[in-house]
């Protein structure tokens, strides 16, 4: 359905001129080849979903399209009635004592572990503190342990200990994964030494728990793959195929237990949708439950207690931040914007799942606010606004002056001020963290994003279908990945001087790939619903136009191949050895990609938020872990 390009009479004569910025509008380059529990209301009361598509007449008598999206699931009462005891000092003091005790465990490894198990013991500790979500407390200990392991690394891998006579697939797979994730230069060729003549990585006729865990670690290692064009990386695909098949068959044979649940989690979330806090929540439930996972009890018990306490203590921080987010949401006039999706709680949850260090409150709140605003703008440009109104709004944003609202229809005035005030506030937060003014830099990113939305609105209004390449180049900008990441990222205690920022943000390949990932994955999940709302333009339709005779299935297969390639390119950009940019500086942008990918794993989780996304909120935000 075409948008109706009719302006209210009061707006027709208004001309908005914008103040130019010093930097020029960019175009993205193409991407490369018991306890007390959380006290809640007696009953959860979720707003009832509505999925009907409709056309409504606004106050100015213009027929406007609305998306019929699911309404907001999280009303004020759900948040305001949250209560948790874990903000009390006693819990924090206990956590601090446990942190010291775990440090002692790291320190004692050099004394207690024999030379036939010293390597696997160090890898076991590093892997488990990371999977349990408590690694931020042990950065020095982790580096020391991995330096030790790497000093014994060979082209054939490692054994369980420094005195082991032969190398071991379990130690090598776990070591390869952990070392690569921390930036050590390790080649995938090492896995070739564990294949037999028919391509099997290990023969497991008994299918013991130990054998199964070897395959779990091989599968986890295989997902940290670089593009196959790199030497040795072909074996990663073979390892993934072999171990995935083995684990899926194993799930059909073994009883329901913590090991089967661990396998299920690993297979379901892999690497690119395995958000760190969600992984921690899932792993807490299975850690230490199987006897083969029970290293000396002191280690397991201390790690598990600390992980549970840390998880619950952070929920007390989340409660305070959610209250702040709700105040912003109400004060910004968001409840009165009825044509859009309201997913501020879901976006906050995603931010909390990738940056749950207490000091990163600015990132979590900034990400939730930016994504909420971008969702409002997306629905306004795609559905509710007319082309002429949207031209006025785009020009008004470029003026960056509250008086620019004089040009706008009434419903746009509040949206404009929400953008204006929030971007300015985030810029002030970024200036505190980075020590320099980044407002003009951020404004340029927002302007580019709205220009790309404007282009899509024109395509929708005229029914024009661009080429696949033209659509994708514009779509990488309109995906809004850059805008959602930029300002929240700059509020963190990670330094982003200009020479580092350009390697993480535009014009870096990391940024280009992240934008491409969001556009490609989003279109594969949204194109049918978008088409039902009158939005014909998508990667799928443009590919089919460029390739006469191609079916939707052909287009989806092509996009999925592209997505697989982008994932490996992203891995390389994050982890390539000898990079001038620390992994910590790139990791947050990379993790934002993982968060968006999670939302689109099975469906458009931002429009249909009552399934996986709702479960994520419940599991990581609202439900505490029993101690």
UniProtKB/Swiss-Prot annotation:
It is found in: Plastid, Chloroplast. A motif (DDXXD motif) lies at residues 378-382. Its EC number is 4.2.3.111. Mg(2+) 1 binds at residues 378, 382. Residues 1-52 form a transit peptide. Keywords: Chloroplast, Lyase, Magnesium, Manganese, Metal-binding, Plastid, Transit peptide. It holds the Pfam family Terpene_synth. The keyword Methyltransferase does not apply. GO terms for cellular component: chloroplast. Mg(2+) 3 binds at residue 530. Involved in defensive oleoresin formation in conifers in response to insect attack or other injury. Involved in monoterpene (C10) olefins biosynthesis. Produces 57.3% alpha-terpineol (15.1% (+)/84.9% (-)), 27.6% limonene (25.2% (+)/74.8% (-)), 8% terpinolene, 4.7% beta-pinene (14.8% (+)/85.2% (-)), 1.3% alpha-pinene (100% (+)) and 1.1% myrcene. The Asp-Asp-Xaa-Xaa-Asp/Glu (DDXXD/E) motif is important for the catalytic activity, presumably through binding to Mg(2+). This is (-)-alpha-terpineol synthase, chloroplastic.
């Amino acid at each position: 359905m075409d948008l109706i390009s009719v302006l209210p009479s009061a707006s027709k004569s208004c001309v908005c001129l914008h103040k130019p910025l010093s930097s020029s509008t960019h175009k993205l380059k193409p991407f490369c080849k018991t306890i007390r529990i959380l006290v809640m209301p007696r009953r959860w009361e979720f707003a009832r979903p509505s999925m009907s598509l409709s056309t409504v007449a606004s106050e100015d008598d213009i027929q406007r399209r609305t998306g019929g999206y699911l309404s907001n699931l999280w009303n004020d009462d759900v948040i305001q009635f949250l209560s948790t005891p874990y903000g009390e000092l006693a819990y924090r003091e206990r956590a601090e004592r446990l942190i010291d005790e775990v440090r002692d465990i790291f320190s004692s490894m050099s004394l207690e572990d024999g030379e036939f198990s010293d390597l696997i013991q160090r890898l076991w500790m590093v892997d488990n503190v990371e999977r349990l979500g408590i690694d931020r407390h042990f950065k020095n200990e982790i580096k020391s342990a991995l330096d030790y392991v790497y000093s014994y690394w060979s082209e054939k891998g490692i054994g369980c200990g420094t005195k082991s006579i032969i190398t071991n697939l379990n130690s090598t797979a776990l070591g390869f994964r952990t070392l690569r994730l921390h930036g050590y230069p390790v080649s995938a060729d090492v896995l070739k030494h564990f294949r037999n003549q028919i391509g099997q990585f290990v023969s497991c006729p008994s299918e013991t728990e130990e054998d199964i865990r070897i395959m779990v670690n091989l599968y986890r290692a295989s997902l940290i793959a670089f593009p196959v064009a790199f030497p040795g990386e072909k074996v990663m695909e073979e390892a993934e195929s072999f171990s995935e098949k083995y684990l899926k068959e194993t799930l059909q044979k073994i009883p329901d237990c913590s090991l089967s649940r661990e396998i299920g989690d690993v297979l379901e979330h892999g690497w690119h949708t395995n958000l760190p806090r969600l992984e921690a929540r899932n792993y807490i439930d299975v850690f230490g439950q199987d006897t083969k996972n029970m290293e000396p009890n002191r280690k397991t018990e201390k790690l598990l207690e600390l992980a549970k306490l840390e998880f619950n203590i952070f929920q007390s921080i989340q409660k305070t931040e959610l209250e702040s987010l709700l105040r912003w949401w109400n004060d910004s006039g968001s409840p009165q914007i009825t044509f859009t999706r309201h997913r501020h709680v879901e976006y906050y949850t995603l931010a909390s799942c990738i940056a749950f260090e207490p000091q990163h409150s600015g990132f979590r709140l900034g990400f939730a606010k930016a994504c909420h605003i971008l969702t409002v703008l997306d629905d306004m440009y795609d559905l509710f606004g007319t082309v002429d109104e949207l031209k006025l709004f785009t020009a008004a944003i470029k003026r960056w002056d509250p008086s620019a609202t004089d040009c706008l229809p009434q419903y746009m005035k509040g949206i404009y001020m929400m953008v204006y005030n929030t971007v300015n506030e985030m810029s002030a937060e970024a200036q505190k963290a980075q020590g320099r003014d980044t407002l003009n830099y951020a404004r340029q990113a927002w302007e580019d994003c709205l220009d790309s939305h404007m282009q899509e609105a024109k395509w929708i209004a005229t029914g024009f279908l661009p080429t696949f390449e033209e659509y994708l180049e514009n779509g990488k900008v309109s995906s809004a990945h850059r805008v959602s990441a930029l300002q929240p990222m700059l509020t963190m205690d990670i330094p982003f001087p200009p020479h580092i920022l350009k390697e993480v943000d535009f014009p870096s390949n990391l940024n280009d790939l992240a934008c491409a990932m969001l556009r490609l994955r989003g279109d594969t999940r949204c194109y049918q619903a978008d088409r039902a709302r009158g939005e014909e333009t998508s990667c799928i339709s443009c590919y089919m136009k460029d390739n006469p005779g191609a079916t939707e299935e052909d287009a989806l297969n092509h996009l999925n191949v592209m997505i697989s390639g982008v994932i490996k390119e992203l891995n390389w950009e994050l982890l390539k050895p000898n990079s001038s940019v620390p992994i910590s500086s790139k990791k947050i942008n990379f993790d934002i990609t993982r968060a968006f990918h999670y939302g689109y794993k099975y469906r458009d989780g931002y429009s249909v938020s009552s399934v996986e996304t709702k479960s994520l909120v419940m599991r990581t935000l609202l439900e505490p872990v029993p101690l």
